[in-house]
Amino acid sequence: HLSSRRQRQMCIRDRVIKRLGVSRTPIREALLRLEDEGLVQIFPQSGTYVSKIKIEAVLESQFIREALECSVARYAARKRNDELLERLSRKLEDYETALNDDEVKLMYEKDEEFHHTLANFCFPNRLWKITNQAKLQMDRVRHLSLAVQERRINVLKEHRWIFQNIADGNEDRAENAMKKHLEYFHHDLKIVQDEHPDYFKE
């Protein structure tokens, strides 16, 4: 994953082609798309590099995600049903299992699935796709922040609080719980910046 590689590390196109067993054309198109999303930089004479993380882009990403997902939390609390609550409960259990097993990659996936479940409950087609696109830059930091044990534990606590307020049908508290959960990202960003200053660009 791009966020877990050293920033500015060269992406060897031929190595990717060999590993995936595909032609140059789709790889080139994929790299151009990543460049458009600000994730890589392409230099025709020297190669393709992972872009440094731009603080402004990360904060914009977080702002958009918060606006979308706080509305999702309100909607879920208002329209909740047994099926939604059962699905969310399973996601919480899955995350806790991954946490106990110290499976960081799986924790990230289960974190995503919790939010994905809520988005799909509201509008099952485009909402998560839009959210996912909006949070691309933010996700680069999130991958790095899960290396911190305390954050892994807090994610579960925050998800449980979101779940409880949705289950209670309390729209204001559900929205506030989601807002606090997503705002904690600013704390995560500071930690990651302090630990990996060379990954970032102002």
Tell what function each PLM region has:
Residues 1-8, 12:
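Single conserved hydrophobic/aromatic residue that forms the stacking wall/gate
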Residues 15, 19, 33, 37:
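Residues within the alpha-helical elements of helix-turn-helix
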Residues 23:
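Helix-turn-helix DNA-binding motif, specifically the short coil turn and the N-cap/start of the second
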Residues 35-45, 49-52:
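Beta-hairpin "wing" of winged helix-turn-helix
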Residues 51-84, 127:
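Conserved segment of winged-helix/HTH DNA-binding domains
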Residues 61, 78-144, 157-165, 173-184:
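Conserved amphipathic alpha-helical segments that form helical-bundle/coiled-coil interaction surfaces
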Residues 171-202:
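C-terminal effector-binding regulatory domain of bacterial HTH transcription factors
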